[in-house]
């Protein structure tokens, strides 16, 4: 694991791909909650932990790669959520603008 960047979970067109297969996850007994886009890094990390009797200093490269992937996933979800919130805010503003155009006098605008 040392000396190279982990494989990207993004395709050239921007879509996502799972690197670890369902069979690999089942073979390594990964819980469903850990079967995400970083599972391909968790499998060697867990193997290293088992083979070194969970010595914390022996699997640092694998742990760093896995935690980096998890952080990147967090940032990706955060960006997607902010884009979704912005789209909803713009949609709400358009609906409000259609209901209450600014060029109508105040008396004509429904307040309820």
UniProtKB/Swiss-Prot annotation:
Chloroplast keyword on record: no
Domain of life, source organism: Eukaryota
Annotated motif Cx9C motif 2, positions: 59-69
Disulfide bonds: 38-69, 48-59
Membrane topology, as annotated: Peripheral membrane protein
Keywords, comma-separated and alphabetical: Disulfide bond, Electron transport, Membrane, Mitochondrion, Mitochondrion inner membrane, Respiratory chain, Transport
Chain positions of motif Cx9C motif 1: 38-48
All copies of domain CHCH, residue ranges: 35-77
Main location: mitochondrion
Keyword Mitochondrion: yes
Location within or outside the cell: Mitochondrion inner membrane; Mitochondrion intermembrane space
Example of a GO cellular component annotation carried by this entry: mitochondrial inner membrane
Entries under InterPro entries matching the protein: NDUB7 (IPR008698)
Function: Accessory subunit of the mitochondrial membrane respiratory chain NADH dehydrogenase (Complex I), that is believed not to be involved in catalysis. Complex I functions in the transfer of electrons from NADH to the respiratory chain. The immediate electron acceptor for the enzyme is believed to be ubiquinone.
Annotated family: Belongs to the complex I NDUFB7 subunit family.
PANTHER family (UniProt xref): NADH DEHYDROGENASE [UBIQUINONE] 1 BETA SUBCOMPLEX SUBUNIT 7, NADH:UBIQUINONE OXIDOREDUCTASE B18-LIKE SUBUNIT
Comment text on domains: Contains two C-X9-C motifs that are predicted to form a helix-coil-helix structure, permitting the formation of intramolecular disulfide bonds.
Subunit and partners: Complex I is composed of 45 different subunits.
The protein, known as: NADH dehydrogenase [ubiquinone] 1 beta subcomplex subunit 7
Species: Dictyostelium discoideum (Social amoeba)
